[in-house]
Amino acid sequence: MKLKKHFPFLTTVFFTIFFTCFSCSKNPAVTLTEDDDTYTLDNGIVTVQVAKASGDLVSLRYKDMEMLATFLTPDNKPDLERDPPGANPDGLNRGMTDHQYGFWSHDAMGPRDTEPAIASITIDPKKNGGKRAEVSIKGISNGRKMGTGPGARQDGQFITDIDIRYSLGQGESGVYTYSFFEHKPEYAYTQLGEARFCAKLADFFDWMSIDTICDFYYPKDHNVGDKYIYTMVQSQNKAFGWSSTTKNVGFFIINPSMEYISGGPTKVEFLGHRDTNPVAAPCALNYWRSSHYGGAEVNVAAGEHWKKIVGPFFLYVNSGESPSAIYADAKAKEKIESDKWPYDWVKNADYPLASERSVVKGQLVLNDPIVKGDFSNLMVGLTSPEYVSPRENAATETRINWQRDAKFYQFWTKGNADGTFEISKVRPGKYTLYAFTNGVLGEFQKTNIVVEAGKPIDLGKLNWTPVRKGRQLWDIGIPNRNASEFFKASERSDPEISLKYATLFPEDVTYTIGKSDFSKDWFYQHVPHNTDPEAQYAPFYGIRAVGRATPYTVLFDLPAAPKGNATLRFAICGTSTRYVDVEVNGKPAGQLSGLVSDGVISNHGIQGIWYEKEVEFDAALMKEGTNSLKLIVPEAPINNGMIYDYIRLELDES
């Protein structure tokens, strides 16, 4: 007591030193060792091994358990003869490189026996008191095609240098990984295929948690047939993975930022499923580019200098008394990691630190004669301006916007009900600002937003006047970029849902404006009507049986015969038909064509590539009294239909 009374400062110092030392004693220093084949990083909580030949994560141990599906030798070491790192077309999924541990689809090896990767220590724990270790496995393309994983040819797939990093910090329950891609100016044209990090997990993982509606017991013998029923919106699930009901441990991939992920806030993707080979290992997947649901792309022209850093993201391992507790902890950890972003330990000129980034804010003001009130689910983003994608010998241009872009970075935020928004941690660059919200057809754009390091931007009030082609006569649905509001959309994961349409609507859909309810009377898939009692669903392929043409009939009343031009406007969020015919009162009025196929129906989705289409017709086709408008999907395989987000009829009588 006398010490505290007379020397309060010394007392404070004493306890600060005591608790600091106590904390240090709880968290051992990070160590880094190596042999001919691997680096081993250890912090007393986790031990990870990285293959020098490829950058594959061949082992991750936690609580003295191997967390990956790694084949082990009798002394519990990774069996790298049975499952060699890098290019390995003779693995369990034959014909492509696919391992039973953690790996990037585009590793640093490239085709086997072409050129060795360069392994190095980029952060040496001996030089920082054991606070952090980092290793690099770098592959120099020199014109080679790199990447031999799923979707790639055995001779490689993408011409780029690849630098794969793993970083382990003191006291961290997991390891970070990231990959730096660089296409040098002297390299030829190249096109990226499926691109992701995959972690295949130990057999004791039996509970998958990738979304609040997809959080369930998933043992090895639970054969779901089709992994596409487990796709989810990436941006809504930044922490996802598996836990074990027998070992009470978890493994989760945590994205602290979505800036390096393709497709923006509406992108649907695989996050987890069981492998399709006989081992059926639990998989956690971090796709940053894929072909799923319309996909995204990275095409790089000959002579183009392109660079991108994917990550760092965190491979988090934890424990708890139940899967729900383990999942809750992982989601809480995601918030912590997001607050840390960008990580100050990343030393790369192409990875701006916090002081080198900026904030962009503003307020959207909606000017619309019908839509009033607060913004609902307002999303605002800064992305690359729309661009022409490089193609070899292309007859037409392919323009890429944020939905299909994986080449550049994107920054999105959820705005407030009053239209205000703030996008933080933005890299320097030139961007287009996009915004969309529930209840409003279309999206807002503002071009030429130039972000400079450390210089906040206040865009002030931004007036948004949605496009209208005339007076609104009626509408169906809610413009929200998906079909969630329509009948049976909540059952999209039922692989046979397309077949059930014919039973639910034997006479097809008839929708009466002012009386019908789209949540009960509008089936969310407009598909060919099945007439084959033997028709069946096939995993990964959907339903190939041919159905007859299907009319959706909309009945509506008009007080007088109209004049002028009518515009039938569509927001489309899933397409696999070639066209949709439009009839008004039994007469042809036009056709929806030039559609964007995205496989949403065969892959059990309710949203893919979103776009607008319209059909203009002479208003004289309509009359006083009751009118009939038909949308007709042609005879075709039952997969070949349409999913609407929203439909609106407008009349310009000027």
Descriptions of predicted regions:
Residues N438-K461, T465-V467:
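Structured interaction patches on ligand/partner-binding surfaces of diverse proteins
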Residues L92-F181:
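Extended, loop-rich substrate-binding clefts of extracytoplasmic carbohydrate-active enzymes
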Residues F197-K308:
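A contiguous, surface-exposed recognition patch within enzymatic or periplasmic domains that forms
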Residues S358-P369, G419, L462:
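A short, amphipathic beta-strand motif
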Residues G415-D418, A545-K563, A571-E653:
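Beta-strand-rich ligand-recognition modules
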Residues G419, G429-V440:
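A short, solvent-exposed beta-strand micro-motif common in secreted/extracellular proteins
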Residues K26-N93:
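Beta-strand-rich N-terminal accessory domains
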Residues V388-T420:
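Short, acidic Ser/Thr/Gly-rich low-complexity loop/linker segments typical of extracellular
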